[in-house]
Amino acid sequence: MSKEKDISVFATLSQSMPGNFEIDDNDRNHLEDDVRKMLKDNVRALSMIQPLIKKGTSETFRNSSGSLYEFLVDNEICIHCPSKLSKCPKKRVGYLLHPVYDKDRDEIKNELRECQYQQEKEKALSLIEPCYNSKEAIYKAMDKTLSFLREPGNSSKMIDTTKLITEVAKTALSFDKEKMYKGYHIRSINSQTLDRDVMMAITYIYTKGNIRVGYINCYKFFAGLVDKDWIVQDEAKRVYQKMIHVPVLMLENLNNIPQVNDEILMTYLYGLLQERDKKGKITYCTTSTSIGVKNLIYSKLRNLACGNEASKLADMIFEEKVIKDFDVRP
């Protein structure tokens, strides 16, 4: 019997049958011998199991042999952890089995828990608020970008990307909410998605520093403001209040704003720029256009009295960052 098949058989038995489930005595003895040997070779696991055994009776070990075997095999995978969720070989990525003693059944059972790296991921993603995008998409874009750049020799293949991310990492490391920062208008001239992925990577870098970040898809946000459903409109307006105050704000596709009336543009585009500048909050944006953000903002508000002022605000809030790299990530 293969080890994988062995695990599934004993795991199923231990989960579906109470207490001392019925298997052939010879198989049970072999299983118990295997568990003892595995515990002897795994000091850390032994230190977790011994206190649980002491809580039980003389039958606890025998009752728990199936679940102990399952735990030890799972723990062996964790011992050789690649320290990256994207390389975790488990079917349930980011989760591990944790043994606990069940007094009623006099056996040790396994609870499924998040591993260290999954906990770190969940904590970081929880700091992306408000979020008008998929948090999982943000994580995957970050992982794709940073994993590639960390490989030896790859940073020289994407020099602009590496430089920009390094600059942001330094800012995040010494971030002071009371200090005024200038953000970036990130434009990638040789890739349609690299600028967005870089901004997503930047988002995650800030959250890893325990800094709250808002991530807004501009089309979705402005579409929400003019949605026929008042509940959707109300939610977009609540999000706007968060956008004003969040320490770091990401605006994806700032040029891609749906057809809205002048009042909406005045209140929520010009108003956002005013509030972010007044509060000294750092803001980043991407656009799918070749023009700079100063001219972009003017083009959106040129028919309003605030057009020139909004253009000046954009120039103060954003520094132009052009990424000339070709996207050579796999």
What are these regions (language model features)?
Residues M1-Q116:
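Long, basic/Gly/Ser/Thr-rich N-terminal segments
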Residues R105-V168:
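Charged, amphipathic alpha-helical linker segments immediately N-terminal to NTP-binding catalytic cores
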Residues E151-P152, A172-M180:
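Pre-Walker A segment
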Residues S156-T166, Y184-M199, T203-H245:
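Short glycine-rich substrate-engagement loop in P-loop NTPases that contacts/grips substrate
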Residues K170-S174, K228-L249, T267, G271-E275:
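Conserved alpha-helical scaffold flanking the Walker A/P-loop in AAA+ ATPase domains
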Residues I211-R212, H245-L249, D277-C285:
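Loop/turn-to-beta-strand initiation segments
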Residues C218, E252-L254:
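Walker B catalytic acidic pair
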